[in-house]
Amino acid sequence: MCEYTAKDYKKGQPRWCPGCGDHFFLASLHKAMAEIGKAPWENAVISGIGCSSRLPYYMNTYAMQTIHGRAAAISTGAKVANPNLTVWQISGDGDGLAIGGNHFIHAVRRNIDLNMILLNNRIYGLTKGQYSPTSPRGFVSKSSPYGTVEDPFHPAELCFGARGRFFARAVATDAPGTVEVLKAAMAHKGASVCEILQNCVIFNNGTHDSVAKKEDRAKNAIYLKHGEPMLFGENNEYGLMQEGFGLKVVKLGENGITEKDILIHDAHCMDNTLQLKLALMEGPDFPIALGVIRDVEAPTYDCLLYTSPSPRD
């Protein structure tokens, strides 16, 4: 078997702004592909329109930048036409969840074997700073000078609502964490949704500051691993317990609480109730969940299409 390095997947000179989160993600994608070990020509990277959607230009794979919001549709066609191809769909929060929102939920619902990467910086960057479907209520932008009056989408809710079987989250500045979820997405057979939290240094700088730096992630984020207790903090001194139908943060050692009392993460549970609660956690009361939150098996559209009986049989 031929061994590949990140360099084998690189192409061209990225033209994003210095410090843009896209640089971090691109490097992680190159590294993940090398570790996965599939040849460049066994991969296709397909995007829509936006800053992050320039990514195919920097991939030494089959690559295509398509039209606004249609990355999922084109990716579906590529995967159905060639099931042996590994397809990476790249979308920003505006491209993927506004004009491309319907394509997004139906690709997830159909469980097409796509690696669906959502680069979420909570802003329209290419068009110079309008609020996006993931911008928080009250967000001030060029298109909302007095603050938005809308509640944002939570990508996890859309994925779970479309009966998604895989959802993971990483921070672009955390290369090991990003590579880990990309490899897990590749290993999963079906629609794999990965939300990547990243910064836009020009129009929404600092939007994910609470988890952007390693020293802050220890206290503001929790890395979920299947089969392991849900612990976080600089010394894993905090954990998650169930309280009624919800969750609560506890400190080990207080009120007799030990590690045995902490919930164990089950990414493979078919019932997504607890997984969704984890995915929706936000600061300051809860840590932001990172890692593979849901990963369950189900037949894929592209497989069933070729194995189901047809009227001609």
PLM feature spans:
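Glycine-rich beta-alpha junction loops
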Residues: 49-51, 121-123, 174, 197-202, ...
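Internal helical hairpin/lid segments
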Residues: 196-289
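Conserved small/polar residues in nucleotide/adenosyl-binding loops
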Residues: 306-313
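Thiamine diphosphate
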Residues: 1-125, 179
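Short coil/turn connectors at secondary-structure junctions
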Residues: 12, 39-43, 81-87, 109-115, ...
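Conserved thiamine diphosphate
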Residues: 132-185
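ATP/pyrophosphate-binding catalytic subdomain of soluble kinases
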Residues: 165-217
